[in-house]
Amino acid sequence: MALSAYAAASESTEDENVIRETFDRLDQNIRNEDCRDTFPQEYKAGAVSHGRYMICLNSVACARGYLDGDKADELIRFCMDRIFGVLGHGDDGIIHEMRTLQGEYIDSEEGHRINPGHIFESMWFVLEQAERVGRPEYAERALHTISVTYQRSHDEKFGGILHMLSDNGTDEQYKDWNAARHLKWDEKVWWTQAEALCALLTSADRTGDSAAWEEFKTLFLWCREHFFDPDYGEWYAVLNRDGSPRMKLKGGIQKAAFHIPRALYQCSCILKKYVAETGDCDAQT
C-alpha cells in the first residue's frame, strides 16, 4: 500500500518490482492456513481472522495499478469470499473477528469478539470494489452490515462507537492484546470512529439513504466535539466512555498518520461531489 502510494506520488518506477514481489508473497501467504499472523497472539491453529482479509483486500486494491489486474482481482474476490462466506454468513449482518475455516464458532474471547472498527473498514473497502470484481451481491451485504454494526455499536447514552462487542452484546471481559495499551471494550478509540465515518458516508452516498446520512452527521459532530483538540489540532487517541480524553497524548502505539487523514480525506471527496451535484449547503458546512 505504502510503496504503491509513493510510486504514484513520485512517478518513480524504482519500487515496481518490489511491489510485485510483495504481492506474490502476500498472495501465497494469505491462502496458506498455516501461515501465522503478524501478531502471534492472534494466531490460533485452524482459525482464520477477519483483519488479515480486510487489509489484504484494501492493500491489493491500492496496488492494483502496478500488478497483473486479473491476479489482483482474483485475490480481492478471495478475500471477500472469506469475509462473507466464513466470518460472516447468513443475513444477520454480523462479521465475526475469528472463526474456523468452516465458519464454525470458536468458544473463546476472540471467537465471540465483534470488532466494529474492522467491520466498518472492511465494508467500505467492499463497497469500493465489489461490483468492479464481479461480486455485486457483496455490495448489498456490505450496506446491510454497516447499518447493523452501527445499530449495535453506537453508544446511545454517551455517543460515539464502542471499541469492542461480543456476539452476545457488549463484553466487559475484553482485554487488549497489547498490555501497554490496555484498551477497554467501552472506550472510544480514534481509528474505530474514523472508519465508521467513512463507512457511513460511503453508504449514504451509494444509497441516498437519509438515515445513513443522519448517522454520519451525528457521529461526525460528536467526534468534532470530543476527539478534536481545538487548541492544538489533531485527535486524541482514546476517550473514556463518557467522551472525556483518557489521556492528552495524540500519538501512541499504532496511532500514526493513517486512519484519520485517510478517512477525513475520503469523506471530504464524497462531500465535495455531493455538494457539486446537489448544492446542499448543509453538507458543505
Map each language-model feature to its residues.
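Glycan-recognition and catalytic cores of secretory/periplasmic carbohydrate-active enzymes
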Residues: M1-T285
